[in-house]
Amino acid sequence: PIAGSMVLAAILLKLGGYGIIRMMQILPTTKTDMFLPFVVLALWGAILANLTCLQQTDLKSLIAYSSVSHMGLVVAAIIIQTPWGLAGAMTLMIAHGFTSSALFCLANTTYERTHTRILILTRGFHNILPMATTWWLLTNLMNIAIPPSMNFTSELLITSALFNWCPTTIILLGLSMLITASYSLHMFLSTQMGPTLLNNQTEPTHSREHLLMTLHITPLMMISMKPELIM
């Protein structure tokens, strides 16, 4: 069910990150050398999840693996125990909660009309549902983390914190961000561009779907303008 996927991606997955933040507070702040393997492991896990996204043919699986990759960044930021790292981790959890929930919502919008989640069978939707294509573009751009979204603020904080803590981590971070941009654009092009394979009549997007997407995208834009609400 789509509601379960949205709640799982937006809330339950983030509770794990919140639990790690609470647990890290009772541990002693140690030297860089001790935590470096765990940070590298978290970032390597994020890269592997991103690469898994690139080879997915199922839309829902792709979005689920993208959540896993973003949580890798969150874990890496929490482990270093710096104020910027914690602020970035909290912001990214909130931002990705909105983004992944919006992506699951859009995937369901597509599924209700095509009855399939296979990427190659859902192409050409820009001809059928142009407004939905706009939402797809906006949400994928948020997933890539472009300004002025919350995702950009959070990834900037995490990147700065990790680079100051250990400059070598920028290699893994940069690779992760590059692959994130690749699979996000791949997802958008696969579902929206190209010739449509649908022959049956498709109903237009409803007002409730536009309202749902507005309520996901608006906080992402607004909170980045006033970040003290969450930091």
Curated annotation (Swiss-Prot):
The membrane-topology field of this record reads: Multi-pass membrane protein
Q: Provide the transmembrane region boundaries.
A: 1-21, 34-54, 61-80, 85-107, 128-148, 169-189
Q: Is Glycoprotein found in the keyword set?
A: no
Annotated keywords = Electron transport, Membrane, Mitochondrion, NAD, Respiratory chain, Translocase, Transmembrane, Transmembrane helix, Transport, Ubiquinone
Gene Ontology cellular component annotations, sorted alphabetically: mitochondrial membrane
Gene Ontology BP annotations: ATP synthesis coupled electron transport; electron transport coupled proton transport
According to the lineage, what is the superkingdom?
Eukaryota
EC number(s) in its UniProt entry?
Answer: 7.1.1.2
Enumerate the GO terms in the molecular function aspect: NADH dehydrogenase (ubiquinone) activity; ubiquinone binding
**Which reaction is this enzyme known to catalyze?**
a ubiquinone + NADH + 5 H(+)(in) = a ubiquinol + NAD(+) + 4 H(+)(out)
According to its UniProt entry, what is the function of this protein?
Answer: Core subunit of the mitochondrial membrane respiratory chain NADH dehydrogenase (Complex I) that is believed to belong to the minimal assembly required for catalysis. Complex I functions in the transfer of electrons from NADH to the respiratory chain. The immediate electron acceptor for the enzyme is believed to be ubiquinone.
Q: By what name is this protein known?
A: NADH-ubiquinone oxidoreductase chain 4
Which species is the source of this protein? Gloydius blomhoffii
